[in-house]
From Swiss-Prot:
This is Type III pantothenate kinase. It catalyses: (R)-pantothenate + ATP = (R)-4'-phosphopantothenate + ADP + H(+). InterPro entries: ATPase_NBD, Type_III_PanK. Disulfide bonds: none annotated. Belongs to the type III pantothenate kinase family. Transmembrane segments: none annotated. CDD domains: ASKHA_NBD_PanK-III. Catalyzes the phosphorylation of pantothenate (Pan), the first step in CoA biosynthesis. GO terms for biological process: coenzyme A biosynthetic process. It comes from the Bacteria. It holds the Pfam family Pan_kinase.
Amino acid sequence: MIRLKAPTPERPLLLIDAGNTRIKWAWTAADVAPPAVAPGGTPWQHAGARPHDQLAELVEDWRDCHAGAGMAPPDVWISVVAGPALRDALCARIARVFDGARLRIVASEAAAAGLRNGYRDPAQLGTDRWVGAVGARHAWPDTALLLVTAGTATTLDIVAPDGRFAGGLILPGLTLMMRALSRNTAQLPEIDIGYLAARDDAQAPADVPSWADNTQDAIALGCVTAQAGAIAQTWQALQAQYPGPYRCVLSGGARAALAPHLRMPFQMHDNLVLLGLQVLAHTGHEGRPGAATQA
């Protein structure tokens, strides 16, 4: 069991997950330990998400949190997979808004917070996958975990019961998969997750058919079945490889569209990456100083 300790108590924590499409964030007091995870998500004090082109609005969200808190500038923990340009823009804006903020850029490494990295080259593992696994390992220790993150890409990651990130799979996300069909064929229409969600809302999960009688439904059902099939096969492999207990955790922006099509028990989580960042902050992890700290 990893012993948690509070960061600098007078400084709140700003946790940032900068993904390929959106920037997710959470704000919490430093003396609040990473919570036990319950169905439905993690109870942050404040949280939100915005697309990359709303950085100005994002900063205002954070400014409002800080004004309400009435305390010192935050300790900021950032996971970025969207590239150095967005990372630098985030750091610059945070430095302008919060004088004295301490920034930490997290990267994948050989081990952290009780989790060992089983990648051949630990640095190659996506930061979001690594930090999300840190969060999941904290929430469900001594458990064989299948972590499904349904975002721009869909990732299936395995955490062994002994605390080793064993590896995983990367698939095109639901939206990317559906768009690829329309953009690389002459006659197939483009549909999105909204169409899939509306289709599923119109029928009970037990009534979802195995095939479709029109092109739009054939695309939607084909793509989501491909994703669900990969998850089911990986779930079976997890059970064959490791002793229990077992848990499948579903997160990411497309999780609600994928959930009705899964046939194994699973638990939803709003953001394992943010939970992992909070765990790292509470285990004394150093991270890499961001631009604001180096200046």
